[in-house]
Each structure stands twice: as C-alpha cells, then as structure tokens.
Amino acid sequence: MIQKKKEWEKTKAEGFARATIDNFLDEETCMKLYEECMNAPKGGWTVFTRAGSHMEEFNDLISLPTAHKVTYDIMHSGEFLYELEQMTGISGLLPDPHLVGAGYSILRNGTVLSPHYDFNWNDRLRLHRKLTSLLYITPNWKEEWGGHNVTWTANPELDPTAKIVESVAPLFNRFVISENVPKGPVHGVSKVECPNDVYGRCAIRFFYYISTSEPDKDNPPHRSTYKSNEYSHHKLHEEEHWDGHYVGQGGEDYGYKPKK
C-alpha cells in the first residue's frame, strides 16, 4: 500500500486523508466473503436505524471461517498494520479484536445511510478511533445501482452550502480507507437501487485505533531490570525476509502482497 502514500498525503491536504485500492484480495477469497455474508447465521444480525438510515450488521465473526481468517490473519496482523503506518504516517495503530461496530454490513435495495460522522472512542479498548476501512464484496456491482460512499464538506442536512468531496462506488473487491478527524469526515451512503435479485450492497468493515495515553509519572518507562543491566541482543541466523504473502493457520494463501 505504500504506493498510495501520495494519494493519502494529497487528500489529507485537501481536508481529510483517504485512499482507494482496487483488487485488494484475490477474487476467490473476496467471493467467499460475500457467500459467507449471505449465509451468516440469522440470529447474529442486528439492524441499525437512525435519521432515515437502515443498515444490517453482523460482527460476531468467530463462527465464520473466511471472515475470521481474513480479519485476524490479514487485517489485524502486524504486517498489515505496518503497511498502514507506512502509508498514513500514523504510528502506533491498533486493531480492535472485539470488532465494535465492525464486521459485515448490508444495505438492501431502497435503503440509505444518512450523512453523519463516526464514533471516535472505543470504550472497551479505551482507545481513540483513527482509521475506518471497508472492503466491498458484492460481485458484479454496477455504478448505476448507487450505494456510493459519499463524503461532504459538512452535513448537507444541516448546511445547505455543503458540497460533495468524493463519491466512491462499492465495486467488488474495492478497499477504501479514510482518517477519522474531529467531527468528521461527514459521509453517508447514497440510495441503493439494485435489482431485487441482488442481495444488497455488502461490505466488511475494519477500524483502527491509537492511544493518546502518557507514561505514568509515578511509574516511568523502563526496560526489563536485572541485577546487572549489561546485555547483548542479536540475530542468531541470517535468513530471507517475509515474502509479502499472508498465509492462514491452515496454510491458505490470501494473495495480498504489499507493493514496495
């Protein structure tokens, strides 16, 4: 993702940082995510309604093998966090293993997500939300079906002078990521107008956080302390570095290979 660094810096200078990456995963894995989303246990779904919004959500991924592996083997991995830090210039990024507000989402035909800005604090982790990302997973999505992720300069329902900054179509295997800023960015999803035989605008969401805590003055930072603090710490062997592929615990190769 380092090749997206210039796009990130350019959009940050315009008001808020964002990037779009097409063909993010291999198609087979992305299709498995979609099929899994369609067949996820009905009892795990919730519906979010507010100010005209209507969105279905599923965040208990432990029973869904593909989403669980993609989340924890790729999106929450140290390698991927490093790639995010290199692209964004933000250090100390942390994933949310509990997936508060994250996981699968569906907007059905005729629904919208009204203009808003996101929650900024994860009370369970005691961390501030810094990045929001989505991977769109409905195959063969057409731009004329709507469901675009739209960003404005202000909330258009409150400010008639608000202008559209960006409108991104939810095309299959497209990954979008943006930086959360104070009271922004204001965004929403345009009306979904897909055929009735299309399941809906499906995505899987991942959020990333940072800590703003400072060291405890009564217990300042220190290394592991021994009787003697003389030590050595060096590599035992010279070997090839990681090749850039994310491999699951079962040996699955998910095909994502960051470009340097």
Feature locations, PLM:
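Non-heme Fe(II)/2-oxoglutarate
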Residues: I2-T88
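Short, flexible beta-strand-to-coil junctions
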Residues: G52, I137-N140
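A structural signal for well-ordered alpha-helical scaffolds and beta->alpha junctions
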Residues: D26, C30, H68, S77-L81, ...
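Non-heme Fe(II) oxygenase catalytic core, chiefly the N-lobe of the double-stranded beta-helix
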Residues: M38, I74-H128, N140, E144
